[in-house]
Design a protein with these regions (language model features):
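Globin-like tetrapyrrole-binding proteins
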Residues: 1-156
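Short, conserved phosphate/pyrophosphate- and ester-handling motifs at nucleotide-, phospho-/glycolipid
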Residues: 190, 276, 366
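Phosphate-binding glycine-rich loops and their immediate beta-loop-alpha structural context
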Residues: 261, 269-289
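Short, compositionally biased
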Residues: 208-218, 263-274
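Short, charged beta-turn/beta-strand-edge "cap" motif at the junction between a beta-strand
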Residues: 198-202, 255-260
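Structural motif
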Residues: 267-269, 297, 360
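Reductase modules of NAD(P)H-dependent flavoproteins
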Residues: 299-413
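Ferredoxin-reductase
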Residues: 150-250, 302-304, 329-333
């Protein structure tokens, strides 16, 4: 797959104007697509992200980021960008035919916003970009489905809530058990599932949640943080799960997906903030069950100790590992009753702790937190390719083609 030389020149020349109008293009694209295909809001698209605008920014930005990568590196595709999108799509059961729907509405929006600037040649060049990206994603998603022995419509399974655990004021953990005899693909440490929830108006809404405990073949565990609107609408799915779903209820969940998975053959450093601890909890649980003796370091930042979700599970797992250490940072001050190796006040400072040699690094938390920690790690001499990150919701880091490359984009190696 390679962008033609003619299209590459046109895309390079028009990227600035597309970037300048990317938000307007995205807004019109989604409005036009949902007017023509309202069924996509039932079980496929997160309408909360539509209200906030993050999904609009992520999709249009990803296309522009893909185009930028093709212009700058014509002989290679941005595999990390594609892999991240493909795993998310597979967790939603996206079908190949849906790419035509996106194409038609996206190209309409580009023409509608840019008007006469979209000549036949410009339209053809961006059409080529889109289909190069779409075909790469379709191929990756086909491989993901095939590896799990499913089709897009059969990624879903029913699970019954066996336990509901209140972790903090706003975080609830669900332990669910399988209730059918179909093959269940074992998750990899760090992966997530999509939970599809029927809302009061009859529309199903999907959300992704990291698995927070090692798989035993019969149970899965995930944790949900209640999204409080603070003047905006509350998160409809998180509040529904926290308030209405009870032990004995059935949840519809996808098979596990996600491309940020643990390299369990090398030392690991986990850096998380807030609810970003959830994928780290899943990885630590796996390491404990595997009897790992590797050097492991958990760095976690939170408002205070009471806000540290899954803290008892995480610390139990760390104590069971012979070469593990934990450092915490609390905005409220350096006060802790937990058995940790270091308690610090304020925001995370990775220069204040010892880090194991040859480690893989995993980041999860708010985007500014991850960007700051990554920069500090690189300044400390950590190779960019040794740093992975997980982001909740649309990946605005990968989608922002005008700032520094995101980890694994191909430009930071």
């Amino acid at each position: 797959m390679r962008l033609s030389d003619q299209s590459r020149q046109i895309v390079q020349a028009t990227l600035p104007v597309v970037g300048e109008h990317i938000q307007e293009i995205a807004t019109r694209f989604y409005r036009h697509m949902f007017d023509n295909h309202p069924e996509l809001l039932d079980g496929t698209f997160n309408r909360g992200n539509q209200v906030e605008g993050t999904q609009r920014q992520a999709l249009a930005g990803s296309v522009a980021a893909f185009a930028t990568a093709l212009v700058n590196n014509p002989d290679r595709l941005p595999e990390r960008l594609l892999s991240r999108i493909a795993h998310k799509h597979a967790s939603l059961g996206i079908r190949p035919d849906q790419y035509q729907v996106v194409h038609d509405n996206l190209m309409w929006a580009i023409g509608d916003v840019l008007g006469d600037a979209v000549t036949a040649e410009v339209a053809a060049a961006w059409d080529e970009v889109y289909w190069l990206m779409a075909e790469a994603l379709i191929n990756q998603e086909r491989g993901l489905y095939s590896a799990r022995g499913v089709r897009p419509e059969t990624v879903w399974r029913p699970w019954q809530v066996e336990r509901k655990i209140r972790e903090t004021r706003d975080v609830v953990t669900f332990v669910v058990k399988r209730i059918d005899d179909r093959l269940v693909k074992t998750s990899l440490p760090g992966q997530y599932v999509t939970v599809k929830v029927p809302m009061p108006d009859g529309v199903h809404q999907p959300r992704q949640y990291s698995l927070t405990a090692a798989d035993d073949g019969e149970h899965r565990q995930f944790s949900v943080k209640r999204v409080r609107g603070d003047g905006k609408p509350d998160g409809e799915v998180s509040n529904h799960l926290c308030d209405r779903v009870q032990v004995g209820d059935t949840l519809t969940m996808s098979l596990p997906f996600g491309d940020v998975v643990l390299d369990d053959w090398r030392p690991a450093v986990f850096a998380s903030a807030g609810i970003g601890v959830t994928p780290m909890a899943g990885m630590l649980s796996h390491l404990r069950h595997a009897g790992s003796g590797l050097p492991i370091t958990l760095l976690h930042a939170d408002v205070d100790e009471a806000s540290f979700a899954l803290r008892h599970q995480v610390l139990d797992d760390v104590r069971a590992l012979p070469n593990a250490a934990v450092h915490v940072w609390y905005e409220s001050g350096a006060d802790s009753a937990l058995p940790v190796d270091g308690v610090h006040a304020g925001t995370m400072d990775v220069t204040a702790v010892d880090l194991p040699d040859g480690a893989a690094y995993y980041l999860c938390g708010p985007l500014p937190f991850m960007q700051a920690v990554r920069s500090a790690l690189i300044e400390r001499g950590i190779r960019p390719q040794d740093i992975q990150y997980e982001v909740f919701g649309p990946d605005l880091w990968q989608a922002d083609f005008r700032t520094e490359p995101a980890p694994g984009s191909g430009e930071d190696a």
